[in-house]
Swiss-Prot record:
This is Vacuolar fusion protein MON1 homolog. Residues 1-16 have a biased composition (Polar residues). Pfam families: Fuz_longin_1 (PF19036), Fuz_longin_2 (PF19037), Fuz_longin_3 (PF19038). The gene is Mon1. Belongs to the MON1/SAND family.
Length: 528
C-alpha cells in the first residue's frame, strides 16, 4: 500500500497552450500545476463582469482530532477500507434491474469488481454528489471512507493526491468544497487521472459557476448538490466515456490525454471562406465574445473578441454539450454556459443551432448579453446563407461523409507499416489523430493501444524526469515518442520495422504533415 501526500496545490489540468497561440512559446509540462495565487485571483475576478461593464450591459448577478499517535493507524485503516470497498461495493447501472435496486446489497456485488474505472464526487461534508457506477445513496459508506481519508490528511495541513492499494490507483482532487476521486485499474498515471477529474470539475462549474457553488456551501455545508445538477447527468457520463473502460472504441481518449482538441480537416480556401462569413456577419455585434463552429467533435472555425482566448478544456465542454443535446438539431437554443478557464464566476449566453437540416455542423455564438437571442439568430441565418452560396456547406458534408482522417494512411504514401500516430504542435492545443484501424478496432486492442500511449505520455511529461525521445521494440509493435521544441509525435509501427526504417518513416511523416499543415490545423484564430 502506497499513499502519496502533497501540500495543497492548484489545478493540475492547467496549460498555457491556448487555442489562439501564436508563435512557438516555451511549452510547459502537460501536467504542470497552476499558480495558486493566479487561481485565487481568477476566482475573485470575473472577466464576463468586466466585459459587461465595458459594453454597458447589465448583470444580476469537523473532524474530531484523534488521540496522539493514532493518525497513521487511522489513515492506514481508512486506506484499507477504501481499497476493499472499491473491490466489492458497487454495481453498474445495467447489472441489476431498477425495481430491485432499493434492496440490493452493494457490499457483495461481484459484478462491480470487473469495472476498470470509477469516479466519485462528494462535498467536503461527505455528501454524495456523483458516482460513475452505482447509486450514490447506496454507496454512502464508501463516500464516508473517502471523506475520512481526506480529513485525516487535512488535519496535518496537507492534501492527499493518490493512493496505490490492492492493484488500484486512487487519484484525489480537492476543489472549492468538493472532493473528486478516480479509482482505476488501467495504465493511466495519477496525473492523467487528475486531468480527467479536472474535466469533471470544469463540467460542474459550467453548470453552476464557481461563485454560485461557493455561496451555496458557505450557507449550508451539507447541501445536496444533486438538486442543482439534476438532469445534467448525461453530460458527466458522456464526458467520462472517453476511454476503453466505457466499452466504446473511440479516439476521444487521445484529446483528453494530450489536453487538446481536434480540428475538422478542410482545404485552406474553404476554412478561410467560413471564417470570413462569420466575421462579416458578427463584427458589429458588440456583445459577442466567441463564435465557434464545430462538427463531429472537431473545430471548424473559431472567431474571438480581441484580447480574449478560449482554452481547450472549455472547448471540450462545448463539444460535450453539443454531443449530448439532440434538441439542438431540431431548433435554435438559448443556453447559459460557464467556461471555467475563461471565467469561472459568470455565464456566457450561447445561441446554439445547426447550420441547416442538410448540414450537421453546429454554430455557437457566445455573448455576455442575455437579451441578444434575436440578434444572434439573425446573424446565424446570414452566415448559413453565405456559406451555402459559397458551397462551404457542401465541403463540410463531403468531409463528414468521407473523412480526411480515414484517408490519412493512404495519403501518407509509402508508410504501410505505420499503424497509428498522434501529432501535436506545441504552438497550439490541437491534435492530429487518424481513425483507428486494424489491429486497434477491437475493444481489447484499443485498451492495449491506450495503455501504450498512456505510458509514453507519462514518461515524456514526467515532472521529475521528462524524456525527449523514446524508442521501444515491443513484442507486437515498435513504438516511438519524440518531443522537440516545436511538436510532439507518438507513433506505432509494425513489429518487423527496424530502427533505420522507423527514422526514415518519421522523417517522411513530418514532411507530409508540414506540407498539409493548414488542412489539419488552425494556425491563428480570427478576431471580430
Amino acid at each position: 500500500m502506497e499513499v502519496e501526500q502533497t501540500s495543497v496545490r492548484s489545478d493540475t489540468n492547467s496549460t498555457c497552450e491556448y487555442l489562439d497561440a501564436e508563435g512557438d512559446p516555451e511549452s510547459p509540462n502537460l501536467y504542470q500545476e497552476a499558480d495558486p495565487d493566479q487561481e485565487a485571483e481568477q476566482q475573485n475576478h470575473s472577466i464576463i463582469s468586466e466585459l459587461r461593464d465595458g459594453l454597458g450591459t447589465m448583470r444580476d448577478n469537523s473532524a474530531l482530532s484523534p488521540e496522539p499517535g493514532q493518525e497513521n493507524k487511522g489513515l492506514a485503516a481508512s486506506v484499507e477500507s477504501l481499497a476493499l470497498s472499491t473491490s466489492t461495493s458497487a454495481k453498474t447501472e445495467d447489472s441489476i434491474g431498477g425495481g430491485l435496486e432499493e434492496e440490493y446489497d452493494y457490499q457483495h456485488d461481484s459484478l462491480w469488481q470487473g469495472q476498470k474505472k470509477h469516479i466519485f464526487i462528494l462535498s467536503e461534508a461527505g455528501k454524495p454528489i456523483f458516482s460513475l457506477h452505482g447509486n450514490e445513496d447506496k454507496l454512502a459508506t464508501l463516500f464516508g471512507v473517502i471523506q475520512a481519508l481526506v480529513s485525516f490528511v487535512q488535519m496535518g495541513q496537507d492534501a492527499i493526491t493518490s493512493i496505490h492499494a490492492g492493484g488500484i490507483k486512487f487519484a484525489f482532487m480537492q476543489r472549492s468544497s468538493l472532493i473528486l476521486v478516480a479509482a482505476s485499474r488501467s495504465n493511466m498515471s495519477v496525473q492523467q487521472l487528475q486531468l480527467q477529474l479536472g474535466d469533471v470539475y470544469n463540467q460542474i462549474l459550467s453548470i453552476l459557476t464557481y461563485s454560485h457553488m461557493t455561496k451555496i456551501f458557505e450557507r449550508r455545508k451539507n447541501f445536496d448538490l444533486r438538486r442543482l445538477l439534476s438532469g445534467s447527468e448525461r453530460l458527466f457520463y458522456n464526458l467520462l466515456a472517453n476511454d476503453s473502460s466505457s466499452a466504446k472504441v473511440s479516439n476521444n481518449i487521445f484529446t483528453f490525454l494530450t489536453n487538446s482538441i481536434r480540428v475538422f480537416p478542410l482545404p485552406t480556401t474553404i476554412r478561410s471562406q467560413i471564417t470570413s462569413a462569420i466575421q462579416s456577419n458578427c463584427s458589429k455585434i458588440k456583445n459577442l465574445v466567441f463564435a465557434v463552429l464545430i462538427a463531429n467533435n472537431k473545430l471548424i472555425a473559431l472567431v474571438r473578441m480581441k484580447k480574449y482566448s478560449i482554452h481547450p478544456a472549455d472547448l471540450r465542454l462545448i463539444f460535450n454539450l453539443v454531443e449530448c443535446s439532440e434538441s439542438f438539431k431540431s431548433s435554435e437554443n438559448w443556453s447559459p454556459i460557464c467556461l471555467p478557464k475563461f471565467d469561472m464566476n459568470g455565464y456566457l449566453h450561447a445561441h446554439v443551432s445547426y447550420l441547416a437540416d442538410d448540414c450537421q455542423a453546429c454554430l455557437l455564438l457566445l455573448s455576455v448579453d442575455r437579451d441578444a437571442f434575436f440578434t444572434l439568430a439573425e446573424a446565424k441565418a446570414k452566415i448559413t446563407e453565405k456559406l451555402r452560396k459559397s458551397h462551404c456547406l457542401e465541403a463540410i458534408n463531403e468531409e463528414l461523409q468521407q473523412p480526411f482522417n480515414a484517408k490519412l494512411y493512404q495519403q501518407v504514401v509509402g508508410i504501410p507499416e505505420l499503424r497509428h500516430f498522434l501529432y501535436k504542435p506545441k504552438s497550439t492545443a490541437q491534435l492530429l489523430c487518424p481513425m483507428l484501424r486494424h489491429p486497434y478496432k477491437s475493444l481489447t486492442e484499443l485498451e492495449r493501444l491506450e495503455a501504450i500511449y498512456c505510458d509514453l505520455l507519462h514518461r515524456i511529461h514526467n515532472s521529475s524526469r521528462p524524456l525527449k525521445l523514446i524508442y521501444e521494440m515491443k513484442e507486437r509493435e515498435v513504438v516511438l515518442a519524440w518531443a522537440t521544441g516545436t511538436y510532439e509525435l507518438y507513433a506505432i509501427f509494425e513489429p518487423v520495422v527496424d530502427k533505420a526504417t522507423v527514422i526514415k518513416y518519421v522523417d517522411k511523416l513530418i514532411k507530409w504533415i508540414e506540407k498539409e499543415y493548414d488542412v489539419y490545423f488552425i494556425r491563428n484564430h480570427a478576431t471580430f
